[in-house]
Amino acid sequence: MKQFLDFLPLVVFFAFYKIYDIYAATAALIVATAIVLIYSWVRFRKVEKMALITFVLVVVFGGLTLFFHNDEFIKWKVTVIYALFAGALLVSQWVMKKPLIQRMLGKELTLPQPVWSKLNLAWAVFFILCGLANIYIAFWLPQNIWVNFKVFGLTALTLIFTLLSGIYIYRHMPQEDKS
């Protein structure tokens, strides 16, 4: 259910873009993200930090897009979110000395410290590369290609990287946890 809720604003954005334009899609994205946030609060009595940060960035960059009638702002939102995620992962590893991935999954999984560090670093690099790819596609290719990349390309890349991470985790799990 949570994954569906996380994906819903993206589906709404895509549908409104195909039916109307980038500005209607941006307004719909803001509304859909707000609805998902409110629903999460009412249903689960909690809102995850990542969801809240994403909502704030959607409102800020989406609002700027609508106010200035300039789609560059909503295009930058994707890269800013990925940069923040990468930054949080790197800071957690190098400054706080405990990888964020380990903080998120450490209660459910037992892995050696070097595995946590490599996994954390891999996700940071993944987010940096996605942010850079977004910049290239958003500002050097037509808008419709960027929308398709944002909705389908980044989603597919994230799913593939999640699967690869799962395989990496499984290979390094203690034998008793694998059964």
From Swiss-Prot:
Its membrane topology: Multi-pass membrane protein
Phenotype for S117L: In strain: ECOR 28
Keyword Transmembrane helix applies: yes
Segments in the Periplasmic topological domain: 1-21, 71-75, 142-148
Superkingdom in the source lineage: Bacteria
Topological domain ranges for the Cytoplasmic compartment: 43-49, 97-120, 170-179
Subcellular location: Cell inner membrane
Result when mutating T110M: In strain: ECOR 28
Keywords in alphabetical order: Cell inner membrane, Cell membrane, Membrane, Transmembrane, Transmembrane helix
GO cellular component, one term: plasma membrane
Parts of the chain that traverse the membrane: 22-42, 50-70, 76-96, 121-141, 149-169
Gene disruption phenotype: Deletion mutant is shorter than wild type and shows abnormal localization of ZipA, an essential protein of cell division. Deletion mutant is sensitive to low osmolarity. Disruption confers resistance to cellular contact-dependent growth inhibition (CDI) CdiA of E.coli strain 869, but not to a series of other CdiA toxins tested.
Keyword Transmembrane: yes
Function: Plays a role in cell envelope biogenesis, maintenance of cell envelope integrity and membrane homeostasis. Required for the normal cell elongation. May participate in the cell division process. Important for the septum site localization of the essential divisome protein ZipA. (Microbial infection) Probably transports the toxic C-terminal region of CdiA from E.coli strain 869 across the inner membrane to the cytoplasm, where CdiA degrades DNA. Toxin transport is strain-specific, mutations in this gene do not confer resistance to several other tested CdiA toxins.
HAMAP family membership: YciB (MF_00189)
Family under the similarity heading: Belongs to the YciB family.
Subunit-level organization: Interact with various proteins involved in cell elongation and cell division. Directly interacts with ZipA.
Protein name: Inner membrane-spanning protein YciB
UniProt lineage: Bacteria, Pseudomonadati, Pseudomonadota, Gammaproteobacteria, Enterobacterales
Gene: yciB
